[in-house]
Amino acid sequence: MLKINCGSGVHPLPGWVNVDLEAGPNVDVVADLGAGIPWPDASVDYIHSEDFLSCLPRIEQVRCFLSEARRVLRPSGCMRLLLPSLERLIEAWQQRPRWLVEHWQRAVGLPLDPPTGGHLVNLALKLNPGFFFDRATLEGLVDAAGFRLREVGYNESPHEALRGLDDRRPDQTVSVYYECDPI
């Protein structure tokens, strides 16, 4: 069984091939996944991507990655995505600004002056090298690449290999958990 963890950085997954743009002590394969995935067609069982997709600086790289993921996945395979949600970020700013600021200070640690939700949203959008996805945009990109998008729960999956991988609980993040099935 071949399982690849895309953009693994300092968060490798044991038993997975950990792939990142830069070499590191826990990186098994160095590759620019925004330009292609270095595996043969239909050779990968599972793909995991935590925050990687939102770090790609150009939407063309997102399209390339999704197309390549579809190419390398077996028909019975699945790709799990965890990525920041534009909807959840804006919802938190509107409904829970104090939580958003407290979470930022705890998880990110960059100073906010003034410590407000509006300042945080602007800073988050500026600092993110890539894209904050809303569901409609992500679904359009995923559909075009040949996948069906499903929102899933924290550490939940019909695929045993994809259960228990999530690093952050829903109360600790504005991210969303998705799985993409080849169609």
Where do the model's predicted regions map?
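S-adenosyl-L-methionine-dependent methyltransferase catalytic module, highlighting the catalytic core
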Residues: 57-64, 68, 78-183
